Design a protein with these regions (language model features):
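C-terminal engagement/docking regions of AAA+ P-loop ATPases
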Residues: 2-9, 65, 242, 248-327
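Pre-Walker A (pre-P-loop) alpha-helix and adjacent loop at the N terminus of AAA/AAA+ ATPase modules
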Residues: 13-58, 246
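Conserved alpha-helical scaffold flanking the Walker A/P-loop in AAA+ ATPase domains
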Residues: 39-42, 95-115, 144
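Walker A/P-loop
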Residues: 44-81
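Conserved beta-strand position immediately N-terminal to the Walker
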Residues: 50, 114, 152
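Walker B catalytic acidic pair
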Residues: 54, 117-118, 129
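P-loop (Walker A) phosphate-binding loop of NTP-binding proteins
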Residues: 55, 89, 157
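Canonical AAA+ ATPase core
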Residues: 96-101, 122, 134-231, 271-273
């Protein structure tokens, strides 16, 4: 592999600094939740989409809004409700009486960063309207394909399935999300910090007043993606990823293991994480760091395992413990 030129290295370092600065900006609005912030940045680098899951009130929506405010990108929000229609997301043809013609009115999906809020509160038919947009980066209305802007990222939030009024996401749609990030309740100290901020006048609806500013733009993102694409992967690392994913298919606790698409996703996220940490090659720790968020939504538990308290995370963690690590 040829050595990078000084100019290429400078561009890569500048892009890395810009994306690292996102953390600082988001921290002005969101206390803690660093793993979720990291996951959002990784998804941007991998051209992927993110599902954020947590109980109501843990700043899932605020986290995505802070990311949008930190980027020089267009953003729109859709609040998913039981009566939301697919055309409310993709857009529709509207009759213009003056011209006696139908014209296309784009829906909120025509943006760079789409916040799909509480995506599991709407029926599957509407959920599936995002499928083509997420996978093909286009929507088809009245037989006409319409490309979406680039970059395009769907950041969806959902409440745990056991909450009233939720619809489990179809497996096909879950697989379209690069990462599923769990947003836990804050620690005691983080919760104290949240209350202190609010007592000092923090308004989550006014991120500009909180000091959140754009620190990265499309050019930074393209430079970063180009650098990630050059991050090298040894045959041993590729084999390690495959062994982890094949082990999920053989687990007695699972009815559904990770597909080859999931293995590709794990390798992609590991490369992005390696680059973010300052390396141009992937090591096993990069794979381990992204295994849970990349794989937890791509496996399905057997009912008897679920009744015994087994979770996708515990199965994947056990697999990481037993699969031999390349040296």
């Amino acid at each position: 592999m040829s050595a990078p030129t000084p100019e290429t290295a400078d561009n890569s370092d500048s892009a890395r600094s810009s994306l690292e600065a996102l953390r600082t900006e988001i921290a002005k609005a969101v206390v803690g939740q660093d793993p979720a912030v990291t996951g959002l940045v990784v998804a941007l680098l991998c051209r992927g989409h993110v599902l954020l899951e947590g109980v109501p009130g843990v700043a899932k929506t605020l986290l995505v809004r802070a990311l949008a405010a930190s980027l020089e990108l267009g953003t729109k929000r859709v609040q998913f409700t039981p009566d939301l229609m697919p055309s409310d997301i993709t857009g529709s043809l509207v009759y213009d009486a003056r011209t006696a013609e139908f014209s296309f009115q784009p829906g909120p999906v025509f943006t760079n960063l789409l916040l799909a809020d509480e995506i599991n509160r709407t029926p599957p038919k509407t959920q599936s309207s995002l499928l083509e947009a997420m996978e093909e980066r286009q929507v088809t209305v009245d037989g006409t394909p319409r490309p979406l802007p680039e970059p395009f990222l769907v950041a969806a939030t959902q409440n745990p399935v056991e909450y009233e009024g939720t619809y489990p996401l179809p497996e096909a749609q879950l697989d379209r999300f690069l990462l599923k990030l769990t947003v836990p309740l804050p620690t005691r100290q983080d919760e104290i910090n949240v209350l202190t901020r609010h007592a000092e006048g923090f308004n989550p609806r006014d991120l500009h007043a909180a000091g959140v500013r754009p620190v990265a733009g499309p050019a930074d993102l393209e430079a970063a993606r180009a650098a990630v694409a050059k991050t090298s992967v040894s045959p041993e690392i590729a084999g390690y990823v495959v062994d982890i994913c094949r082990a999920t298919r053989e687990s007695p606790s699972l009815t559904l293991g990770v597909s080859p698409r999931g293995a590709t996703a794990l390798l992609s996220t590991a490369r992005a994480w390696a680059w973010l940490t300052g390396r141009d090659y992937v090591i096993p720790d990069d794979v381990k760091a992204l295994a849970l968020p990349t794989l937890r939504h791509r496996v399905q538990l057997r009912p008897e395992a679920e009744m015994e308290g087994v979770t996708p995370d515990s199965v994947i963690t056990a697999i990481l413990t037993h699969v031999p690590v390349p040296r």
